[in-house]
Each structure stands twice: as structure tokens, then as C-alpha cells.
Amino acid sequence: MIGILKKVFDVNQRQIKRMQKTVEQIDALESSIKPLTDEQLKGKTLEFKERLTKGETVDDLLPEAFAVVREAATRVLGMRPYGVQLMGGIALHEGNISEMKTGEGKTLTSTLPVYLNALTGKGVHVVTVNEYLAQRDASEMGQLHEFLGLTVGINLNSMSREEKQEAYAADITYSTNNELGFDYLRDNMVLYKEQCVQRPLHFAIIDEVDSILVDEARTPLIISGQAQKSTELYMFANAFVRTLENEKDYSFDVKTKNVMLTEDGITKAEKAFHIENLFDLKHVALLHHINQGLRAHVVMHRDTDYVVQEGEIVIVDQFTGRLMKGRRYSEGLHQAIEAKEGVEIQNESMTLATITFQNYFRMYEKLSGMTGTAKTEEEEFRNIYNMNVIVIPTNKPIIRDDRADLIFKSMEGKFNAVVEDIVNRHKKGQPVLVGTVAIETSELISKMLTRKGVRHNILNAKNHAREADIIAEAGIKGAVTIATNMAGRGTDIKLGDDVKNVGLAVIGTERHESRRIDNQLRGRAGRQGDPGVTQFYLSMEDELMRRFGSDNMKAMMDRLGMDDSQPIESKMVSRAVESAQKRVEGNNYDARKQLLQYDDVLRQQREVIYKQRQEVMESDNLRGIIEGMMKSTVERAVALHTQEEIEEDWNIKGLVDYLNTNLLQDGDVKEEELRRLAPEEMSEPIIAKLIERYNEKEKLMPEEQMREFEKVVVFRVVDTKWTEHIDAMDHLREGIHLRAYGQIDPLREYQMEGFAMFESMVASIEEEISRYIMKAEIEQNLERQEVVQGEAVHPSSDGEEAKKKPVVKGDQVGRNDLCKCGSGKKYKNCCGIVQ
């Protein structure tokens, strides 16, 4: 009954039947494609491109295009895709995952949808797990695409920007997932659009899709950098701020907690640091450090806002009074307080840009993937990536013998049995592949085999090129290969002619916590209808067994008087192992889903900033955008200084001081003018005055220079604030889980606080851009500059996120050294005077 119901409701079977009809259409075209000459076959590419411009779609072209690729593959590669490979290609073209068993020719299958989608001219990315496979596939399958008149590029980590641009400009680009992600991040840090390497993300086919979208989903790609100069600048700024007097050199509004330099304070700073104009663009960092130093001394109070504990500044939660260890103030305020209190200044390496593979690959217009094992993660692929898993039938029936697990009482008994099995099979000449979960296990088995005099190869993921050679030899007579965690995926184990009748023996030394990894190991045997055998050896001391209560089973084995050499073969134990694996997979899926929910907060913010950066880069005139920022800044300032209900309590003097100091000239806005107006009427005359001053500034220089000046200011401010914001979000994320103890949902809290921080950053960007546009003097040799030099942090091999290391620095400037502020004078005659 269940079997009948399965057939009726089997979605996969219905998909296969539907695709079978398309395969028949492709087969029917063979008679008209086969007689074509090489030139005529190549000419089909141009014909298809023209038909696309006339309104046909890639779906309309599919049968013909696939028939053309099949014929070209036969001529160029000597390989003719089978019907099941055509099905796999259709599934990929439709944006799904093709589950094709090992040895069924996934690489050749991918050429079909790659060719079809490359006809649009928008670019197709073929994604692999390592550069060796990318180079191999680009050179082997590239011949086929080039024969048909398409261009093929390969994107490697070692390439220059120009080489990468060329690779991405090709119709088809082969690359690793890491390199694609890093290039995307780097493209959103460049200052000129000519420096971008990637085109809009159109279509990607991911090889070993489960490895990239599931196993590596929790590993973020990070570009980090270090603000080298700032540590000394905090100390100089701190020394300078100590010399300032309240009301004379700076003004402080108790209600708004706003502190700023007065005209006298600005003059004092210019004298102290030997500069002409504090608001000059080249002194952005200095002004920022002075402002934060002021906030540290005037706004932040020891034992109220923070405490000093064991040489560190620890924030005090204003609502609960609890210490918030591990949290740091953003925008350099924390370092300014460290300078104020005389503790060591920790200048952490900053995260300049970050993205997870989940969010990177979800940006593609269409995404598909192929692997031998995806069905167990079908729910995840559907919910997160909107891709269905379609299991493609094998070309020949699988005749592999998958044996029931053998369970031993102890690890020692298990390993003895494993080695004995290997030795027996080796004597008969049968090739053996031994799969281990940990490197230590592979080394232990290697030692035991060496003692028995059995020659063998060890394979772990250290050398991709050598890895392929070892895997290629793993199917010859008498070969013994030990592989850790299925290193060597992507390369087939081909059987030697003299062992075709016995096939490969695959021995698993313990169950992985994921059924998918076990299935990958099993799938190495019995490819393309070959014979083969798979056997897993388990012990009651294995981690998975221990984790899910093997004590009862062990006690039963003791009661039955079973020793280490006697295994039990029990369906009950096998079912228990499988249910344990399902539980672990469920937990891991929940963890990845939760990561995505957190990362989505930053994703939305990242998309806003990157989109605006792109617009700035491509825009010829930013004046309209900047006027909008000035308007917002003025409206916020008016609202902040007139928030009290009673008119007498409005701080009009503070508003006038703020406007004349930060945006206009002394006397441009007068108190008596504003006092006659309601708050909603105040902004208009102020904005009119700002635009008048803006127009005056425009007349002082050629238009081209003014437009470039605007871009320099916008890039400098946006990039500085955005990198500080990412860092602050990092710190928020690290401490947010502690909120769960207070019966608060950490995710909701992270979303709310993250949004508030983003809004605050946007306001800060608008205010700072307005200030620099109005106050900075424009130099002749304007140049856009990177705020911090970024460096890609490659994910560690064990999949853990690369941790940020604090860099602790003291004052390292000698009295006779050149001053770090860039004046060219000796430290003792420059910033050293202030101290």
C-alpha cells in the first residue's frame, strides 16, 4: 500500500517523466545536427544569440542547444552525454539541484546548461571547492565551449585586477566560492567604477553544492584591516583635550549630550597641531579623534558610564547597572576613553566587509547545483535557497553491495577488525578505500597497516593536486587508500581492467554525524554499474554512539559475554544510529537557519550601503543628494534643540552655535531670527542660507573639480562610518546571547538594536558629509583614498570563523622621531608640545 502511495505522490518521479519528454525532443534533433560541419555547428551559437535578441527565450532554445552541445562534446571530448545527463542538465537549467551519483559525469552534464545560459551574454559562473578543480574543469570543458565560439575565463586568487576583469568578462567563468565572495566584497570597496571586476550576478552552477551551501554555510568571508595610525592619534587628541576649557574652547549641551569645539577651540587645535584648517579633508582622522576625546572627557563619566577593571574599560549598562564585559563603544569612543584613563589602547583589527556564502549565492538571478548527495538536506535547499533536489536516475543500475554495520564493543576491537579486513582484501588484489572522520584515525590505521606490511596512501585535504593523483590510482589492483572526511571529492576512482569483476571495497571506520557524508563515502564504489562493496565498522566508544546512549547496548554485550573480536550486526542499532544522525542534522540545520536570520539584519544594511556607493560611483553630479543630506541634518538639529513643549526651554542658542560652527560662518544664522519662528518653519531659511553658501563655493573652482570634491567627501565619510558600524555590529552580536538570560529574545533584540545603530550611522554620515562639504577647503590635487587597506581573511580549514585578534599598542613615538600627524616635523616640536 505504502509503495503504491509513494508512486502516486512521488514528485521526483513526475519531474523525471516530464524531463524524459524533453530528452526525446533532443534525441529527435540528432539526425539534423549530426551531419553539420564543425563550422556549421559553431555557427549555431550565433544563430541562437540572434534568436534570443528577436524575443525567443533560453527555454525555447533548450532542446536545440542541448543537441548542439551533445554533438560538440562527442567531437571535441570524445564523450557523448547520456539521456540521464541531459536530464541533469535540464534540472540545472531550471535552477534546481541535480543529485547525480558518483561517476555519472556531473562535470560533462554542467556543460549543457552552462552553454545555454551563456548565450545571453550575461555571464555564467561555474563554482568549485578548490582552485585545482576550477583549473581542471576550465581547461577540459573549456575546449568544448571555445569550439562552439564562447569565451572561457578562470578566476584565481593570485590574479591581478586586470586579469580578473578579463576572466569575469568571459561568457563562462570558472572560480572557487571563496574567490567569488571576496571579489564581490572588494568590488564594493573600490573608489572608481573602472576598478570593479564582477558583472551583475546572473547564473551560477555550484559543483559539490552541499559542501559549499551546507558545510561551509556558517563560515563568513571577512576582509579585515587595521587602522594603524589611530592609536597614537588617540593619545595626542587626549593630551590636547586636557588643555581645553569649558564654555571657552568647547560647548556642552547637557540635555542632548552634544559637545563641540567653539571657534576658539578650533583655533587652539590648529595651533597645537600646526595646521591651517582643522576641517580640511586631510585632517578628517585628527578631527574625529579630537571629537571622540572631547566626548570621553566631557560626556562619559567613570563609575557611571564605565568602570576601569583589570586595566580594561568595561561599559556599565545604563538600565540595569550591570557590567557589559566584551562590549565596546563604537566609532573610536572606547579607545578615546582608554587614552583618557591611561590604560593600554586596544586597536582591534577591523572587519571592513563580510558576507556569508548563504547571502552571497542568494544574490544570483538563478542558482543551481550538483552533487551526489543532497536529498537528506532537501528541506534546507528549498527553504533557504528556493531550489528543489531532483534525484537523477543512474545510467546503469547500481549493483553495489551495501552491507549492514558491524558494531564492536571497543575501539580497539573495531580497528583490529578493520585492518584484518583490509589485509584480506589486499591479498586478493581488491582495491580498498578507507574513510575516516579524523586525521588521528587515519594515522592510527596507517601505523597498523605498516606493521602488517601493507603499502598504502594517506589522503587528507592538504594538497589538492597530489590528491587527484592518489584518487586516480585508488582503483588499481591491490591499492589501499586512507581518506579523511572524503577528501578527493570531484575526482573519480576509475577501476583497473583487472579488478572490474570485483570492484572497489569502501570501508568506513565510524559513522559521520551527517548521513550525507556517509553516503558520499559509499558512493565512491559501484560507479557506472560497476560491482563494489561498502561496510561500516562502529564501536560503542565512537563519539556518535556515546552521544546518544550506547551504555545499554554495551551492558547487553557484556551480559552476553561477547568479547572485542565479536561484532553484532543489528538492524536496531543501525536504526538508532540513523535516528541519532537525523537529530544532529536537525540541530545543525537550526544553527545555520539561525545564523541566516542574524546575517539577514546585516545583509539588508549592506545592500543599502553598497547600492548607494554604486550610485555615487556612477553619478556625475552628487549635489542633489548632498542637499538632501543637509536638509535632513538641519531638520534633525532643529528637532533636537526644540523638543521641549514650553518655548522658553528651547535651546535656540545651542542650535545657532551648532549651525554656525559646523555648517555655516559666524553670524550667518542669528538667534533673534529663529526665535520668531515655529520649529517647523526654522529649517527653511537655514537651508536657503546653506544653498547660498554652497553656490558661493561652486563659483570658486571649475565644476569638474567641485564634483570630484563631493565624491571624495562622500566616499571618505561613508567608508569610515560603514566599517565602524560593521565592527559595532560584530560586538553587538557577540554579546547579544546574554540577553536570553533576561527572558528577552536575542534575535529580536539584535534586529532592533542593529536597526537603531544603522539609523544612527546614516544620520552621522549625513551630518559629517554636510560639515565637510561646507567647511573643508578644496585642494587642487584631490584624490579618492581607501580608508583602510583591506586584506581577505580566508576561512580556516576546520570551518571556524577567523577570530579577530586585539593588537595592543603603547606610545612608541621617540622625541626626535618624525611626528605621526604627517606635518613633517619632529615629534617634540609638533604634537609632543601638547603633552
Swiss-Prot record:
Q: What InterPro entries does the record tag this protein with?
A: Helicase_ATP-bd, Helicase_C-like, P-loop_NTPase, SEC_C_motif, SecA, SecA_CS, SecA_DEAD, SecA_motor_DEAD
Going by the UniProt record, its keywords in alphabetical order are:
ATP-binding, Cell membrane, Cytoplasm, Membrane, Metal-binding, Nucleotide-binding, Protein transport, Translocase, Translocation, Transport, Zinc
What name appears for this protein in its UniProt entry?
Protein translocase subunit SecA
**Similarity-based family:** Belongs to the SecA family.
The record lists the catalysed reaction(s) as: ATP + H2O + cellular proteinSide 1 = ADP + phosphate + cellular proteinSide 2
Region annotation (Disordered) ranges: 788-807
Q: Where are the transmembrane segments?
A: none
The record's listing under Pfam families reads:
P-loop_SecA (PF21090), SEC-C (PF02810), SecA_DEAD (PF07517), SecA_PP_bind (PF01043), SecA_SW (PF07516)
Identify its membrane topology class: Peripheral membrane protein
Q: Name one GO biological process term.
A: protein import
The role this protein plays is:
Part of the Sec protein translocase complex. Interacts with the SecYEG preprotein conducting channel. Has a central role in coupling the hydrolysis of ATP to the transfer of proteins into and across the cell membrane, serving as an ATP-driven molecular motor driving the stepwise translocation of polypeptide chains across the membrane.
User: Does 4Fe-4S count among this protein's keywords?
Assistant: no
Q: Which residues bind ATP?
A: Q85, G103, E104, G105, K106, T107, D492
In which compartments does the protein localize? Cell membrane; Cytoplasm
Q: What class of enzyme is it?
A: translocase
Q: Tell me how the cofactor is bound.
A: May bind 1 zinc ion per subunit.
Q: Which GO terms describe its cellular component?
A: cell envelope Sec protein transport complex; cytosol; plasma membrane
The molecular function terms in GO held by this entry are: ATP binding; metal ion binding; protein-exporting ATPase activity
The entry's Zn(2+)-binding residues are C819, C821, C830, C831
Report the principal subcellular site. Answer: membrane
Q: EC number(s) per UniProt?
A: 7.4.2.8
Cofactors required: Zn(2+)
Gene3D superfamilies the UniProt entry points to: Helical scaffold and wing domains of SecA, P-loop containing nucleotide triphosphate hydrolases, SecA, preprotein cross-linking domain
Assembly: Monomer and homodimer. Part of the essential Sec protein translocation apparatus which comprises SecA, SecYEG and auxiliary proteins SecDF. Other proteins may also be involved.
